[in-house]
A protein has these predicted regions:
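N-terminal winged-helix
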Residues: 1-36, 147, 186
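Short beta-strand-centered segments that line the small-molecule binding cleft or hinge
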Residues: 4, 10-14, 31-69, 73, ...
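Secondary-structure junction motif
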Residues: 7, 93-117, 182-187
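A late-sequence structural motif
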Residues: 7, 159-196
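Ligand-binding cleft/hinge of the Venus flytrap
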Residues: 11-20, 42, 106-120
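Short beta-strand-to-loop elements that line the ligand-binding cleft
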Residues: 22-30, 119-129
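Short secondary-structure boundary segments
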Residues: 50-51, 75, 148-150, 178
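Flexible hinge/capping segments at coil-to-helix
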Residues: 58-69, 73-95, 183-186
Length: 196
């Protein structure tokens, strides 16, 4: 999605300067569809949310961003005035989830995360991308847990607040064929500095 690509914008820019002749194409899709396309050789690389992604032995990855998670909530919601939000204050409020995180491990981890926060019974809503999630949240009817750096996008009508006692990080991964000898893939991967 847009967020995942955003995590590697500077590397794409640098790669394009180094290899102006290279043809770069972008394809959006769910984690499952992108992993499937990688496995079938239809893609050279994919940038995915690392939450619950299980890579087969034929794939390798680099972390493009490891980002603290925060609550994204409407700026007009009373909780937006707080510096930090306790999970119990979110009880009963619908949660907006990103449909792109469609693998069973991802869905299970996300469900477990909300359950550990005491929010197992909150109604779920689904959207196809971060902008749609932000628009739903802007209405004041729902919230979501998001990577903190999404706040840099300047999305009007939403705010980001830490969740008391919640220290999870969102990891985004560049995924590529393990041991690839393709010079384009190797050159691009070398631009991703190792992160924790």
């Amino acid at each position: 999605g847009a967020y995942e690509l955003w995590t590697i914008v500077s590397q794409i820019r640098k790669y394009h300067r180094q290899h102006p002749e290279a043809e770069i194409e972008f394809q959006l899709g769910s984690n499952q569809s992108l992993l499937g396309a990688l496995a079938e050789g239809q893609l050279d690389m994919a940038v995915l949310s690392g939450f619950g992604v299980e890579l087969g032995k034929e794939l390798d990855s680099r972390v493009t961003l490891s980002d603290p998670c925060m609550v994204m909530i409407s700026a007009s919601h009373p909780l937006a005035a707080k510096k930090e939000i306790h999970p119990r204050e979110l009880k009963g409020m619908p949660i907006v989830l990103n449909r792109a995180q469609d693998s069973q491990p991802s869905a299970g981890l996300i469900a477990g995360m909300y359950a550990n926060m005491g929010l197992r019974e909150n109604k779920r809503m689904y959207a196809d991308d971060f902008y749609s999630i932000a628009l739903i949240i802007n209405t004041g009817i729902a919230f979501s847990i998001m990577p903190a750096s999404v706040a840099c996008w300047g999305i009007d009508g939403v705010v980001f607040r830490p969740v008391q006692g919640f220290k999870a990080k969102a990891r985004t991964l560049l995924v590529y064929p393990r041991g690839s000898q393709d010079t384009g893939i190797r050159s691009f991967v070398s631009l991703i500095k190792p992160k924790r």
